[in-house]
């Protein structure tokens, strides 16, 4: 205990508690997707898809390069934290991507407005993502 400045101990405790509470808030993230009309949509309102060739729970995406140019991944920031049915996979380029129930999530470049689902069933391997 600091006998010269007793209020310093109280100030130190308050500062430590504040830092702990604020630090916890910084790591909280809202869900990376929303449900609209029974399908998952990204923060921009656009439909999200899963790729049948991605193995659920593998921790990676097999849609890279030209595939990812047509099916852009729903990217996660390095500071994002997964919770619930959401997880984060690491792409071949080292960047992070959101996944739902272990399946990486993607947009389709030919969807032009929220509510479009033109990629559903594409090549019989792309499906709208559902909760």
Q: Where do the model's predicted regions map?
A:
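Short, exposed beta-strand-loop hairpins at the edges of beta-sheets
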Residues: 107-121
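Bacterial N-terminal signal peptides that target proteins for export
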Residues: 2-15
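N-terminal Sec signal peptide cleavage junction
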Residues: 24-25
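A low-complexity, Ser/Thr/Gly/Pro-enriched, surface-exposed linker/loop concept
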Residues: 60-87, 124-129
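Short N-proximal segments of mature Sec-exported proteins
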Residues: 44-52, 58, 66
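Acidic glycine-/aspartate-rich tracts in secreted/extracellular proteins
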Residues: 52-57, 110-114
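Short, low-complexity cationic-aromatic patches
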Residues: 32-46, 90-103
